[in-house]
Amino acid sequence: MEKALNSLFLYSLILLGLFSGQVTGQAIFSTDSYPDEKGYQDRISGELKGLASSPTLFRSQPSARCPDTGIKFKTWALEGEIIFSPFTGRAFLQGPTGYFGPKKRDENGEISYFGGDALKKDLLPITAKLLLQLNDSLLRGFLSIPGNLQQQYHFAAKNWARFYPLLADEMGPAWKSEFQKAVATYSASNRPSDGYRKYDPLSTPHNLVGEPDELLGGNKKDGGTENHKIMWRSSAWVYAAHFPDTALISGWPVSEVKTLSERYFSDFYERLLKTGNGEYDSEIYYPHSIEGLLNLYDFAESESARVWSKAILDYLLATIAFKSYDGALAGAQKRGPSLMNSGGELNKMFHFWFGSPDLDPDHPASLHQITSSYRPSKYIWDLFHKSFPLPFEVKVSRPSYHMDQANHAQEYFYGSKNFGLGSIYLTQLDNPNQQVQWSLVIKTAKGPKTLGGSQPFHRSPGGHSPYTQTAQHKNVIVVAAAATEVPGEETKMSGNPRLNLAQKPLNFLAAPTSTGQIELEKWFAEAKQQEATWLFIPKGLGKIHEIKNKILIENSEAYLCISPFSSDHYWVEAGADSNFPKGKAKVLADYKLLVVNGSFSGYCIEIVESDSYASFSEFKDSINANSRLEVDIITRKVTHTSLALDTLHMEYQSTALRAKVKINGAVIGFDKWSPSGVYTSVPLKVGEGVFKGDVNGEIFSIRVNNNKPSYD
């Protein structure tokens, strides 16, 4: 029982000591510099057993109902096959097997194909169970079904690529041979998911190895998202390291897979240093990319695989660490959730590596993380814990999603001791449901609290409404919404998402008449095209004071001033007896909602550290004396004067997605947004093929020399 587990941790310790110095070249970026190994081990203690103790769910196993008793039971039958009731012995036909159920059998009568992507989730607790109890014959049998071996879609492949190096030898030579045969022929012309979704046909079948001339081996149309491609390509490289030289991976010889894989990941890293990545700071999908890279780091068994996987891991974690406050992400995200920072994979990873609060203790640990020898360096630790001079500003030039257009969007971030505020100037509606346009995170004694909002197209703190534009300078942000117009030339663009999503007019919607569940759910359903701007304020954030058309929030860590564009605003809260098990309105379980009405609606938020004032009264007096907001509804212009006497001027652009902005009278240009090229800040600069770090006098740079990262 202990054999696989003991060998795993021995293997990890050997690799940690053997390779870290060779890979990093500089102590500042070495995994050995990670400053909290004891704390990390304490935090992950018992997590493998916890993962193993979770119920084993065979989501691919269909159900049937006894025609005599009406009692349901599980089967392994295909639709139309004869089955027998275990209660009465009656023979009858298996009905539909569900999305994940078995669909085909091979010539030996074994299930050769399942629907869906069940092993995205099911394989992880099974792996944990087998690491602790190798002789579980039921689980070993389940993982020997040919249809399960064939599940090499990206999420499942990423899980198999951790299972195989850890447990393949324990499964035996015959199992390994069958697994290698499944991998050798894997190709899919459909796109199974972990939910009941169907997609259009693919232009090119998916496989593990990919298309050699495309970014990470996937074409822009339907070759997979950034995290999909990282999971597939990393899995192929791991398989290539552990399969015989004569084996095939999706039809490709092992030797060619190794060469192609190195090319994919080296090219991706070089692009990161020139443009940044397209799926930036994704709270949803970064964990899956990270897990694929951890597989490479731990198991690809070549110096080049460890070098490139570590370099990319370091980049992803460093560039997200400075935006993290107590494990919650502030600022913009690409492919982020509509309800940010509610706990999940990324927060769990932060908790284990950095000791930040666990926002959802019931969420399972990442098997990949807790069985990996990779550790973030002290530099990344310092970025995460803000162990450098504060406050700080960061400008980021974001590329298009496929990294083929630099500076496609412009992000700004302001970080202080207890809060982070960030936003992005967007030029395209691209997967707007998963675009976080702006957010504010505040550290509190009760954990991090996240604010967000916009015109209620998505009715959530996140999402990109085509009617919303922002402007930010340091600790001040203006959020505005109005009707838009689509210029004539844009109407000729095929598939123009702005034309499709922003052509409907905005309409007045009266406030809900009660705080009851039915009324609020109905109101939320009608609010998508409301002529208003919403602000989601976490419950328990602090005491709220409403003074002279300003809303002040008193918190022990920070003070906020919210200035609505007009006096026509109101609060929406759920009643004490309301319960929202599903739907958009469930957000009111954790938030109260400020609604600002108007054809040109919005608000300005200014936030300061509470210890920068002797008392809240002093802050209030300073707001009354210095803070000013001027709004011209006709011209859609806003000018805000801050406590620091900086002026932030926004001019809403009805025919665009990005406002015109002036700061202290100077026009803000977007063409050369980030002087370094990608990231520009004191602790972190990226661009023109170089990553530069500077924390407390420890200065280093990384660039690619002789086809590998060079640390200076």
Task: State what each model feature region is.
Residues M1-L10:
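Bacterial N-terminal signal peptides that target proteins for export
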Residues F9-F19:
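Bacterial N-terminal signal peptides
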Residues G21-G25:
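Sec/Tat signal peptide C-region and signal peptidase I cleavage site
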Residues Q26-N227, M231, F243, E256-F265, ...:
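Ser/Thr/Asn(+Pro)-rich, low-complexity disordered segments
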Residues R162-D169, W237-H242, E291-F299:
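Short glycine/serine- and small hydrophobic-enriched flexible loop segments
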Residues H206-N219, T275-G278, S282-G292, L329-P357:
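Carbohydrate-binding/catalytic loop surfaces
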Residues S255-I320:
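Internal, well-ordered domain-core segments that constitute the primary functional module
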Residues L294, E303, V307-I370:
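Extended amphipathic alpha-helical segments with heptad-repeat/coiled-coil character used for oligomerization
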